[in-house]
Amino acid sequence: MRKSYRIKKEAEFQNVFDHGDSVANRNFVIYHMKRDQPHFRVGISVGKKVGHTAVMRNQIKRYIRQSLLELKPNIDAQTDFLVIARKSANQLDMAGTKKNLIHVMRLAGILNEDIEVI
């Protein structure tokens, strides 16, 4: 995803934490907030408790980014959201990551239409 689709600054992360709503499942927590903008923005956080090595944390982030890239046409454009991985997320493969993200994003109301989970 392009940099314009990412939330990078700490102040922007904190704004979504403070003023947004949260939804969670077993593997991910999503904080989301409506905004007036041409496209959605996403921040991804994977802590050291999730994966003890940088390789594992980066792999989880790659899985999340790829899943979001595939879901991009169905994500509400007026939303900023943060995806925070929980400890159990390190057990997921790419398909499991996408399935769990679809589930939690449906709960948050971020997805515009129904998507079949493969």
Swiss-Prot record:
GO BP, sorted A to Z: tRNA 5'-leader removal
Keywords: Endonuclease, Hydrolase, Nuclease, RNA-binding, tRNA processing
Superkingdom field: Bacteria
InterPro entries the record matches: Ribosomal_Su5_D2-typ_SF, Ribsml_uS5_D2-typ_fold_subgr, RNase_P
Matching PANTHER family: RIBONUCLEASE P PROTEIN COMPONENT
Assembly and interaction partners: Consists of a catalytic RNA component (M1 or rnpB) and a protein subunit.
Name of the featured protein: Ribonuclease P protein component
